[in-house]
Swiss-Prot record:
Name of this chain's protein: Replicase large subunit
One GO biological process term: symbiont-mediated suppression of host innate immune response
GO molecular function, one term: ATP hydrolysis activity
Region spans: Methyltransferase: 50-458
Bridged cysteine pairs (disulfide): none
Domain Alphavirus-like MT, first and last residues per copy: 72-281
Pfam families in the record: RdRP_2, ToMV_Hel_N, Viral_helicase1, Vmethyltransf
Stretch list, region Helicase: 830-1085
Amino acid sequence: MAYTQTATTSALLDTVRGNNSLVNDLAKRRLYDTAVEEFNARDRRPKVNFSKVISEEQTLIATRAYPEFQITFYNTQNAVHSLAGGLRSLELEYLMMQIPYGSLTYDIGGNFASHLFKGRAYVHCCMPNLDVRDIMRHEGQKDSIELYLSRLERGGKTVPNFQKEAFDRYAEIPEDAVCHNTFQTMRHQPMQQSGRVYAIALHSIYDIPADEFGAALLRKNVHTCYAAFHFSENLLLEDSYVNLDEINACFSRDGDKLTFSFASESTLNYCHSYSNILKYVCKTYFPASNREVYMKEFLVTRVNTWFCKFSRIDTFLLYKGVAHKSVDSEQFYTAMEDAWHYKKTLAMCNSERILLEDSSSVNYWFPKMRDMVIVPLFDISLETSKRTRKEVLVSKDFVFTVLNHIRTYQAKALTYANVLSFVESIRSRVIINGVTARSEWDVDKSLLQSLSMTFYLHTKLAVLKDDLLISKFSLGSKTVCQHVWDEISLAFGNAFPSVKERLLNRKLIRVAGDALEIRVPDLYVTFHDRLVTEYKASVDMPALDIRKKMEETEVMYNALSELSVLRESDKFDVDVFSQMCQSLEVDPMTAAKVIVAVMSNESGLTLTFERPTEANVALALQDQEKASEGALVVTSREVEEPSMKGSMARGELQLAGLAGDHPESSYSKNEEIESLEQFHMATADSLIRKQMSSIVYTGPIKVQQMKNFIDSLVASLSAAVSNLVKILKDTAAIDLETRQKFGVLDVASRKWLIKPTAKSHAWGVVETHARKYHVALLEYDEQGVVTCDDWRRVAVSSESVVYSDMAKLRTLRRLLRNGEPHVSSAKVVLVDGVPGCGKTKEILSRVNFDEDLILVPGKQAAEMIRRRANSSGIIVATKDNVKTVDSFMMNFGKSTRCQFKRLFIDEGLMLHTGCVNFLVAMSLCEIAYVYGDTQQIPYINRVSGFPYPAHFAKLEVDEVETRRTTLRCPADVTHYLNRRYEGFVMSTSSVKKSVSQEMVGGAAVINPISKPLHGKILTFTQSDKEALLSRGYSDVHTVHEVQGETYSDVSLVRLTPTPVSIIAGDSPHVLVALSRHTCSLKYYTVVMDPLVSIIRDLEKLSSYLLDMYKVDAGTQXQLQIDSVFKGSNLFVAAPKTGDISDMQFYYDKCLPGNSTMMNNFDAVTMRLTDISLNVKDCILDMSKSVAAPKDQIKPLIPMVRTAAEMPRQTGLLENLVAMIKRNFNAPELSGIIDIENTASLVVDKFFDSYLLKEKRKPNKNVSLFSRESLNRWLEKQEQVTIGQLADFDFVDLPAVDQYRHMYKAQPKQKLDTSIQTEYPALQTIVYHSKKINAIFGPLFSELTRQLLDSVDSSRFLFFTRKTPAQIEDFFGDLDSHVPMDVLELDISKYDKSQNEFHCAVEYEIWRRLGFEDFLGEVWKQGHRKTTLKDYTAGIKTCIWYQRKSGDVTTFIGNTVIIAACLASMLPMEKIIKGAFCGDDSLLYFPKGCEFPDVQHSANLMWNFEAKLFKKQYGYFCGRYVIHHDRGCIVYYDPLKLISKLGAKHIKDWEHLEEFRRSLCDVAVSLNNCAYYTQLDDAVWEVHKTAPPGSFVYKSLVKYLSDKVLFRSLFIDGSSC
């Protein structure tokens, strides 16, 4: 028995140890069967092919997220956002798995090609073309189908059976498979479909309003809809940028605009409504009718994608029941129905109840937010005292662990330092017995200091509050208030007074005598509360600030927002304003509104000076000087008070301007001027305004405009009389131009001293023998002017200003009521039309001459309208219903008709706005139509010194109508009009190109014999007009005179070589000049000017582009695409056309002769021939003069011939030549400079120009050199570099003044023809050892990070680790309609020109950013006198300063030096945008800024050989920056790209493929051909021989996008 037991035990132990073979075989068999069953089950899963190239980590993400599928990863297709694109296929299949096979399904916004390939003939795809991107995607799906069918046809195969039904359906009835209507408006009618209907929405519900979704589903009889969309919980915080790390995408939020994009990609962004998406997330029920709703239920969240389903619910199926007492009661049935309806209403209307009122539901659907709270963090600027606030998500357990612990501290121990120490200790890792224990809470370490301050302040206030409750304000000799302040004083030390003031200001503490009240603010907001608040804010859409009011600075913020509308609000002194409000106890918002009302002329009070300064206001209110005797006064009421102040005191003001400078005490009471004859022999002084006084206008804006118009007539009259008086006083000194406008009659001799060009002048100025001057009404007899005995001379003017102004003044004076103009109640409609839109034609078609009135500015226009209206032979237009404005006002009341039904004013915007208001009132019309052009020549105030405020120039209207189709202008002019007008301007003209220009040798060349001018002759100035008339040309007018006219052909002439202000790119005169012709315009000019540039640009426009502006009728269908492209680049895919010869032709045109250079053996020739070199002090090891032989690998041979050279071999001679041409060739241009003081001033300018004001001082609490910074630096290094540091103990530094020297084997190609005459030097690299870089690398990395965080990124771009898309975003908000100067600073020998001054500037910048003094001194000495050693070439030398091209600060150092250089020379406070990168810079300034002599300053101060270029387009880091009216696009330099295709260093085909991919990455923007025309202009600006290059851009796209085709650009060198 004992043996049996022993044997059994032994056998059992053998089995356990695995020594029993029988048991082992059974276990293996069982394991095998289990594995087979598992693999068979896996094989039965749906199979999905994943062709996109993704990483192993992304492969694991996809596999774990979708275990329902058997995914095969092929990694055969490179694509943008590969993971997201591949996951989209998995998401589609997952949604289709939820639907019974064969049931009718609507795919909202789906991919119909995917369903065809899967053989789903029961799916209808609703694919609306909401934007151009949708059209492109749909065309791509069609292409994929055609590609699939062509492959089958090429292989002799047919469509598989499982696909045949779907493909037959698509071929026969395509609208049954796919439509392009929105889901809400889709009208698809299924054919004999039974069973339930389903729908899926894959990333498409964003664009369907949530309020319309339920009804749209019901209209299609959908039973269940399955949807998927992207979302992130962090969108509910105050962050404007949220990352989706798993798919490398991001959300950015701006108000209600939510933008989704993929990081590091140039694909188009997707814009949605944030409030709409929030409704889909938060709402549970989506009403479809008064009976049915769709209930939403979340299914699962996978890889940043949320899945949910919407189920159709019939609310009539709800249980009907109610408690009752009497069965027979009639109220029973009513109560039952009411209760049931109430129950149904709750289900349909309280749609947010389930999610918003149940916090557990929130925690379930937002698992990351469970037990998380939102804690506010605060910061304050020491300079400006401005407070900033942000929010972070922190574990609730962590918050209360800290609060509960620090609440136990004694009063002396409760300090900020102790709180921070405790918070850091519970967050840090702990090492126990050599094992690292991770902290329970993963809180970002960068937040610990701010969190500690929040915890500390909250606890401190809570402790004080508890003490107050206990003590009840009685603690012996000291009051509780005194005890509290003592406690706070101990905590804060010397900072106590400011802390006390801060607590009082924030109203966290209030003091009233000895009583003290403390309010402890809420510490946090839960995620559930934030979700509820965000959702309700999006539904109700109020202007709600959901932040806790923990500071009263919110009021000040709103006040400053109110003030931000003012011009130059950035210069507003916020501190002074704040102190004023505090000291006077004034509400900041009230004060801000008053300031804005006065300074923006919205207070009903207009000050005609520029700014309401103290001096100007005092001048407006001061007493006036005494008037001279004999003054003629135009007044309409009695005046009692002797001054303007008196009038203001009693609440009324005299009509401005009628009295000039004269005081009211000199007015004649009740003196009225009944007729113009009363002006006869009035003293000239009474009409001449010697000085324009500070006038105050009151009343509504229309009244103020009308008063200003009366003043303008007075000013015009006084100016005309003054000019005639001046001529009489000095007749001999009149120039030729003035003589043509005036005449002077000598009364004694009856001769004209200056003969006037016209005759029978109605008015003149008379000089008497007593040297008195009077205005006189002239009469004529047989001998001429009738004169008086005491007259000496008479001056007349060919202009009728005196007579017309007097007549209009007389009329307007009669219209005044108690000195105030009357404003009509008629409706005023502004018809804003482009040139040639048919404004006159429209007036004639709408007018009824029996009851309407037409007013025009000039006689010619009035005659033209009468002629066109009476062309049928029936006289309908007469001088009674078609008048000039002057005639109507001068003869008002003399016509038989005084009232009109409608008033039409042609070219009304050329009139003074007050004049228009008077015309409307005088016509007594019911409605007035003012036809004009807001971009053409407006009313011009021609009286120098007369104030015409800017807000007076805007006509007050009730309605605005636009006309944007021109019947006159050809297509090229229409292209120009689109730059000037909002909205799309179209043309009905069949003429495409009509403008041309000709530069003439001088003004003398223009004469009728040698240069006959075709068509209508126009000029810009009166002097040019008179010159042409004097030379024999006829019918010549100025541009201003012919506004509104139309001519077949126009010759525009400029004879004035000096600058003319009205000839500018944005000038209305240029617009009028370009838009007068219907067939042709030719511009003859003696100088280059902006109009020449405009015409040259229009001449280069392609015909297909001009076809876009062609319209056959007046409908403007193109207006519909405005919303598609607004604020983003238009994308037009570039056709893939062209050949290698296109690239070669383009290169040869741009750089003629470069491709013929045979430079393959230049390096060999230099080594073999004698050479003479001038060398500075250096040591040469001649044993290294002969390089060691190496095996030569024959590279691939390029088919494109460029100036590229073969890689050179390392050697003493090659390295020495490079060192001589670079390190030994530094310029010496600088003058005598006080280095330290000048460097300090330059750095002051640098910080003031580029850094945000609140970040100009370093954060001394942050350590620059730490373990974290070293680890960050090590992560960027290669393994070889880290290996070099294995024996470095970081105790002592190697010699910091010792550098190694080497060079790049591949010479740099220059985009010029210098290769034809010189041997290019190689680029040298001077670098430290890795041990020194390990010290300074992390240090400068942290300093660089601080610098870039402090830069004003809205205006300045320091190009470090930026993508082309980020460059486009930075320059994207440039307004192309605003005239700008684009500046580039070109510096040669930039690195080697830097001397002691540059070193001092850079050191001062780093020092102010927090660079430690000892290491700073070490770094400075390491860049002063330095030793260079080239062990390969055997060269050793010494250089002073210079930029080391391999130093840790090479790139950022060069960047800050170029920025500091420009800040010291240019007015950076005026800059619009600025970008800096190494030695490259690009600046955008407002047009017309004055710049100093940059070359002189750069030479003397900076030792730079510099040139400042002004360009139309920027060139930055090898890329052209093309700004346009919708944003900005960055094109890689196509010539540089072609130059790289001639590379002779490509080793093999694998190296070639890597080369192609790198070129594809930088040249991706060339795929967009929408802005090729602007790119042509930009290239031509640099290379004047460059032809239009769209053909070569398309060729580059073709070859770069096809790796097989790209191989044809090279041939194998080993086979040659």
